[in-house]
Design a protein with these regions (language model features):
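Active-site environment of divalent metal-dependent phosphoester hydrolases
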Residues: 12, 60-63, 85-86, 128, ...
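Active-site neighborhood of phospho(di)ester-bond hydrolases with catalytic His/Asp-centered motifs
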Residues: 27-30, 51-58, 78-81, 143-146, ...
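Cap/insert and terminal regions of metallo-dependent hydrolase folds
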Residues: 153-252
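Metal-dependent catalytic neighborhoods of phosphoester/phosphodiester hydrolases
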Residues: 64-73, 88-91, 226-233
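Structured catalytic core of nucleotide-sugar glycosyltransferases
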Residues: 5-15, 58-62, 66, 77, ...
Length: 268
């Protein structure tokens, strides 16, 4: 049995909590420690009980608090070598990671944390490096895919393996292209190493999800170029084109950008 909690999912800050009865981890650390403490405490949880932190990539909204978390709570932080170097270069990380708390992982490597198996996989994004994570117990497969420019074969395979998926649904293309962003930023977002749109994200799920998929959460929605109702509506429209119905074939939810979710218990 897995437990899942989103502690922030936007360009302002990203952090996700996953736990079994025996171990608790965070994926990404872009939310201030004070907010993490408050939101965990409200749900009967505590930072002191976290066992490890896994980082997807070195953009500030995913790493701002990682140094404070590691040093204040004596937490091992798992990253690829390139992401680790990027963290220590990033001026937004005021407390750098020291060797004591650094755990370097390779892509496709599986790390066992208690009864949880965490496997990284490569995803395309314009950071120093970027990975998604597959978190497994003996019963569940949970996949987190955020900040991706396009769907690679690796990502497609991870979607097919999952019972539960957190996946980026960053922007509506029309809102982005008609919006106030400068041309270079629009180009960056739409590139193969930028961010995935609502429609492309939905198509990825529709084409590659297995019948074992139970639940999907949309994450990392742009505040300027998207909104939750539009992301959901786009997903529902694309799914129907493939003969799938949200709420029937699997549950579909949208994670809040700057507010923590409820603590969810996941069962297959």
């Amino acid at each position: 049995m897995l437990k899942f909690l989103s502690l922030g999912s936007s360009s302002s800050g990203n952090c996700y909590y996953l736990a079994t009865d025996n171990v608790q981890i965070l994926v990404d650390a872009g939310v201030p420690v004070r907010s993490l403490k408050h939101d965990l405490k409200e749900r009967g949880l505590a930072l002191n009980d976290i066992d490890a932190v896994f980082i997807t990539h070195d953009h500030a909204d995913h790493i701002k608090a990682v140094g404070h978390l590691a040093h204040d709570y004596h937490l091992p932080v798992y990253t690829t070598e390139e992401v680790h170097r990027g963290i220590n270069r990033n001026y937004c990380v005021t407390t750098k990671l020291t060797p004591e708390y650094t755990r370097i992982i390779q892509k496709s490597q599986t790390v066992e944390v208690g009864d949880m198996r965490v496997t990284s996989f490569s995803v395309p994004h314009d950071s120093s490096d970027c990975v998604g994570y597959r978190i497994e117990t003996d019963e569940e497969v949970f996949v987190l895919i955020t900040d991706i420019g396009h769907a690679t074969e690796t990502i497609q395979n991870e979607v097919s393996a999952a019972n539960f998926i957190v996946i980026e649904s960053n922007h509506d293309v029309d809102m982005l292209m008609m919006g106030p962003y400068p041309a270079y930023l629009k180009g960056r977002i739409r590139s193969g190493r930028g961010h995935i749109s609502n429609a492309d994200s939905a198509k990825l799920i529709a084409e590659h999800a297995s019948p074992a998929l139970k639940r999907v959460w949309l994450c990392h929605l742009s505040e300027e170029n998207n909104h939750p109702e539009l992301a959901r509506k786009t997903y529902e429209t694309v799914l129907r084109e493939y003969g799938l119905i949200a709420g029937v074939d699997f549950q579909l939810d949208v994670l809040r950008r700057k507010q923590a979710s409820e603590l969810m218990v996941l069962k297959t």
